[in-house]
Structures are given as C-alpha cells and as structure tokens.
C-alpha cells in the first residue's frame, strides 16, 4: 500500500504535531514487520537485514514531493521541523526498537529512492538529506546505511554523486541501471577500487522485462567481467516484475553461474 498523494498527511504547521513516536507493538504495520523478520530468523537461523524508510523519502511521502521541495526553498523552518520530527520521533526510535528485537542483525538498510537525481539536486542532498542519514548512523550505529540513490548518469562528472553515496553507505558502492548502462560499469569499478570498497551493480527491471535472453546474458557477462575483476563484487536483479519473461530470468541466472566464478590462484 502507498500513501494517498492527493491528500497529504502533512499540510500545515499544526499537522506536524501528528508526528509522534508510535507504539511499535500495536500501531499500523510495525507489528507485522517484526513478525515477518521473526519468521525469517526462525526459517534460516539468522537475523535478517533490517529495513527502514529514510527521512527524505518519508517526508516526501507524507508531505508530497513538490510541496516538500517548495518548503525547502521557501519555508525552510517548516521543512527543518518536519525532518527533525520524523528523524527523532519516528525513524530513530523504530531503528532502535528493531535492534533490540534483532540484536544480531548486521545491516540496517534505509530506502531512499526519492533522494535521487534529478528529483533533487546536489545542494539539497548536501544540506537536507545527508545530514539526517549521518544523524541516524551516529545514534543508531555504523550498521545503518542508505545505498539506493540513483541518477549519477545525469551529471557530466558522475563521481561527484558517487562521492556523496559513499558518505551514507561507506562500505560499498551501489549502482543500477539505467545509470550503469549509460555510463558503463568501468566507472563504478574504478571508483570503488580507488576508495577501497566493494561494488554492487544492479541489472534494471525494465531491461529484464523488455529484452531478449541473449541481451540479458550479455549484460550480466559484461557487468561481472568488469565489476568482478579483483573480487569484492555483487550482482543483483532489480525488482523483477511479474511481466518479466521467465526465459530472461533463466538467462540471467545461467549467465551468473557461467561467468560469476572468481579465479583462484
């Protein structure tokens, strides 16, 4: 389920009072998330990767993207109060609650797709987005990270955006189509090796759904051969849709099995 974008939850200063710490044991879908994570732990005997919605994307959902950007430009005090309340009253307590329930979880991953180019620009990222993720890391621990910003292919110098990505996800660099297809996997590999971090590349969902199996296999091969050089590489398939031909998924998996083996020696 998604929010009703025609009727945002936050319309005025008075609405900010609605943002209070929930009862995670009973309110909304919080108990369901805990139950699903518990079932995962019982099934595989290991704590799951914990997930949360990052401050900017949450603010955009409950305020509306256009309104939020206008707030940043014309009503910064209102925008700051919105971000502060969401971060301090909802997101931080939720992460700490999850950590208490799943103390052996090694990763706490924030989803923040709306904090991507060209939806936002570099100054907004630097002033309004990164500081709140860093606050989460400071209070909730270094296991917190936000990996899924996209849009570096919009820039003449993609590395300017990759640098910002590593500030909120310092252990690995993630890129996905269509960015990787546009600027090439070698750009990501070079930047990851320069900064001594692992690399994660994603094959786009649209590409998987609309391409022929041979094209899928070729892209998987290319990303593995370039991204996997010297190791420290992971490939994933982005949000496979129900319309994706089964033969394309099989082609991707077969290509991974064929090319995704590190040479030992």
Language model segments and positions:
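A contiguous, low-structure linker/loop signature
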Residues: 1-22
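Active-site loop segments of alpha/beta catalytic cores
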Residues: 2, 22-265
